């Protein structure tokens, strides 16, 4: 992970009241406006993994039917690991970027090989997850969040956009500072809800590129825009 770039300003210190306000507003917005998506009704790590890999670079509307069909064809890690690659790729058709299907199958195969019991399972710690093929820092953290509600921060481009915009910070924060920011505003005990709120807010309100600008809100001004000066 890249750190702070040379000559980059230090990350401002957020006032506690700002953090609490951001958490309350985003979670309140989510409780009233959150999307109902099938992978949000499960805590099965394998199903969560399938959804996370499918959602990379593919629209939600295209993923939903494929997600259901995939879990019918390969309901367990063992089923996917044992499936011929050509069958897996056929099941993936329509989602694009076939390397994701290969990575998903490789990950399942590795989990099965390292299983200590009769049933394969994905690890529950970040270091162990990162040792599996095809899992990067975001996907590994997302598994811990959505399957186990662990208090870790999972940062992707949408989370970057929401946090930096809503807190009035530079969108070009270095990866180290961005991770520190995400951890600083994480409401402990509500990690899963918080990350879903960030994702839905980024998808429905603070949209990605539109009309030649980096992002565009569909309503008003930022939820919170109060950042203190840097710590001495």
Q: How should these model regions be labeled?
A:
Residues 10-18, 24-231:
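Catalytic cores of DNA base-excision repair glycosylases
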């Amino acid at each position: 992970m890249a750190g702070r770039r040379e000559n980059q300003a230090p990350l401002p210190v957020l006032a506690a009241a700002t953090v609490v306000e951001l958490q309350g507003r985003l979670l309140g917005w989510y409780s009233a406006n959150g999307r109902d998506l099938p992978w949000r009704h499960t805590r099965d790590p394998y199903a969560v993994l399938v959804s996370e890999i499918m959602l990379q670079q593919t629209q939600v509307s295209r993923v939903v039917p494929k997600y259901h069909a995939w879990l019918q064809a390969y309901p367990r890690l063992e089923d996917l690991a044992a499936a011929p690659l050509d069958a897996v790729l056929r099941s993936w058709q329509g989602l694009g970027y076939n390397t994701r299907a290969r990575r998903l199958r490789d990950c399942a195969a590795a989990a099965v090989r390292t299983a200590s019991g009769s049933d394969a399972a994905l690890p529950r710690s970040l270091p162990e997850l990162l040792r599996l093929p095809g899992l990067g820092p975001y996907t590994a953290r997302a598994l811990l969040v959505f399957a186990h509600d662990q208090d870790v921060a999972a940062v992707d481009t949408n989370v970057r956009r929401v946090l930096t915009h809503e807190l009035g910070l530079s969108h070009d924060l270095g990866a180290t500072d961005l991770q520190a920011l995400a951890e600083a505003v994480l409401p402990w005990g509500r990690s899963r809800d918080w990350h879903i709120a960030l994702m839905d807010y980024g998808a429905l309100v603070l949209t990605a590129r539109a009309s030649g600008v980096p992002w565009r809100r569909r309503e008003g001004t930022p939820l919170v825009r109060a950042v203190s000066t840097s710590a001495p």
